[in-house]
């Protein structure tokens, strides 16, 4: 069974379309109007082995917030839809990923209980205009709309680009693990009988 989904969202502020294939090879076509965000989403797809298409336009002349948050909403909805009833998935995933001097941890439970813990130090903003707070808004929207509990922690890092990149890579690798199918799991991985 092909685990893929396409979701669109249009508001007065943004227009977003996402297609995701969970069992992909990491191919990506990303266009958000925000170069650094494009880079983060591209490496998210590559390191998670998701085939991902994101087309987004928004009021980035105001700021990046609306576009980044809405991409998180639509990506979360897309992954949630692609997971279906979540039968047979490993459900849990984790990764520790370095990027030069930065080290990020990500732990995921695809529990249908949305929650974000984001323990990432504030770092002076880089020239990209895409800071740690914006990354937090993306992951909050993503976690809530995917129905996942997501814990993110950065132990250390000085360069904001490296910190944010290590986070995106860690989440991608953890999500790849959590969405992976396991032949030993015949239904939802829960004593309740559902996730």
From Swiss-Prot:
| Signal peptide extent | none
Recorded GO cellular component terms are: cytoplasm
CDD domains per record: IGPD
Q: Which InterPro entries match?
A: IGPD_sf, ImidazoleglycerolP_deHydtase, ImidazoleglycerP_deHydtase_CS, Ribosomal_Su5_D2-typ_SF
SUPFAM superfamilies reported in the protein's UniProt record: Ribosomal protein S5 domain 2-like
The record lists its disulfide bonds as none
What are the protein's UniProt keywords? Amino-acid biosynthesis, Cytoplasm, Histidine biosynthesis, Lyase
Q: Where in the cell is it found?
A: Cytoplasm
Q: What is a GO molecular function of this protein? A: imidazoleglycerol-phosphate dehydratase activity
In which domain of life is the source organism classified?
Bacteria
Q: What is its EC number?
A: 4.2.1.19
Query: What are the GO BP annotations of this UniProt entry?
Result: L-histidine biosynthetic process
The catalytic activity, as recorded, is: D-erythro-1-(imidazol-4-yl)glycerol 3-phosphate = 3-(imidazol-4-yl)-2-oxopropyl phosphate + H2O
UniProt keyword Iron, yes or no: no
- Catalytic EC class: lyase
Pathway terms, separated by semicolons:
Amino-acid biosynthesis; L-histidine biosynthesis; L-histidine from 5-phospho-alpha-D-ribose 1-diphosphate: step 6/9
Give the family, as the similarity comment puts it.
Answer: Belongs to the imidazoleglycerol-phosphate dehydratase family.
* PANTHER family attached to this UniProt entry: IMIDAZOLEGLYCEROL-PHOSPHATE DEHYDRATASE, IMIDAZOLEGLYCEROL-PHOSPHATE DEHYDRATASE HIS7
**NCBIfam families to which the protein is assigned, alphabetical:** PRK00951.2-1, PRK00951.2-4
Protein name (database record): Imidazoleglycerol-phosphate dehydratase
Please give the organism.
Desulfosudis oleivorans (strain DSM 6200 / JCM 39069 / Hxd3)
């Amino acid at each position: 069974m092909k685990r893929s989904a396409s979701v669109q969202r249009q508001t007065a502020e943004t227009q977003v379309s996402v297609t995701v294939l969970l069992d992909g090879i990491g191919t990506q076509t990303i266009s958000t109007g925000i170069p650094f965000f494009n880079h983060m989403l591209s490496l998210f797809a590559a390191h998670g082995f998701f085939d991902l298409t994101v087309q987004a336009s928004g009021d980035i002349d105001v700021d990046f917030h609306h576009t980044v948050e809405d991409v998180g909403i639509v990506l979360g909805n897309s992954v949630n839809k692609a997971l279906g009833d979540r039968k047979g998935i490993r459900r849990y995933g984790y990764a520790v990923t370095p990027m030069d001097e930065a080290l990020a941890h990500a732990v995921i439970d695809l529990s249908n209980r949305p929650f974000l813990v984001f323990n990432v130090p504030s770092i002076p903003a880089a020239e990209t205009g895409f800071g740690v707070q914006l990354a937090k808004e993306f992951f909050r929207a993503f976690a809530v709309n995917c129905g996942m509990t997501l814990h993110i922690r950065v132990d250390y890092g000085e360069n904001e680009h490296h910190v944010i990149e290590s986070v995106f890579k860690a989440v991608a690798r953890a999500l790849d693990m959590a969405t992976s199918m396991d032949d030993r799991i015949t239904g939802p991985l829960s004593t309740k009988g559902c996730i």
